[in-house]
């Protein structure tokens, strides 16, 4: 489906729900994708990762440690999803939320992460982890250096497969104490 924003969809859903298990929101396209400081993130229908994962807060989490762990998990998942295309220095996270890949003579933005906290009264109850990755985009209109995985490494990874890999890894990694 098309949605304005998977994070907004998840946040709206959480107003009436309080899941005790992970819930994944994904779309073929979002029309009002957002990043830090209300910046827009553009995607092409069916060609990019557009997802938000809702997780109940775990006792061992703190907001700062969670953000760092999410970023490192996204980075390692991209490295694993594209074997042979990258080495350890090919993917980095520019704090707090930009995912960059090396191409040619520099780093280009390939995706972003937006972690939003949900509070019930004074209790931190859930997080919404929004992730966008340029997988097969051709129209990258951001005002900064952006690239897609397919343009950088002629990757044929499916956005749907990458969504599944990201969701599984995040659920596994964030469940473990860190």
How does the language model describe each region?
Residues 58-91, 101-178:
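Long, positively charged amphipathic alpha-helical accessory segments at protein N-termini or as interdomain linkers
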Residues 1-83, 89-90, 105-107:
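N-terminal lobe of the biotin/lipoate ligase/transferase fold
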């Amino acid at each position: 489906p098309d949605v304005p924003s998977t994070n907004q969809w998840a946040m709206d859903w959480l107003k009436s729900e309080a899941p005790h298990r992970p819930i994944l929101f994904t779309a073929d396209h979002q029309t009002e994708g957002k990043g830090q400081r209300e910046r827009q993130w553009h995607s092409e229908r069916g060609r990019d990762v557009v997802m938000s994962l809702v997780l109940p807060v775990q006792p061992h989490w703190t907001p700062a440690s969670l953000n760092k762990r999410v970023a490192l998990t996204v980075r390692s998942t991209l490295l694993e999803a594209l074997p042979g295309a990258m080495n350890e220095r090919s993917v980095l996270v520019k704090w707090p939320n930009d995912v960059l890949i090396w191409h040619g003579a520099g780093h280009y933005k390939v995706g972003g992460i937006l972690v939003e906290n949900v509070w019930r009264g004074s209790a931190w109850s859930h997080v919404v982890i929004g992730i966008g990755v340029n997988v097969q985009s051709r129209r990258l209109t951001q005002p900064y250096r952006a690239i897609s995985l397919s343009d950088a490494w002629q990757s044929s990874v499916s956005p749907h497969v990458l969504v599944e890999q990201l969701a599984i890894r995040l659920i596994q990694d964030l469940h473990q104490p860190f």
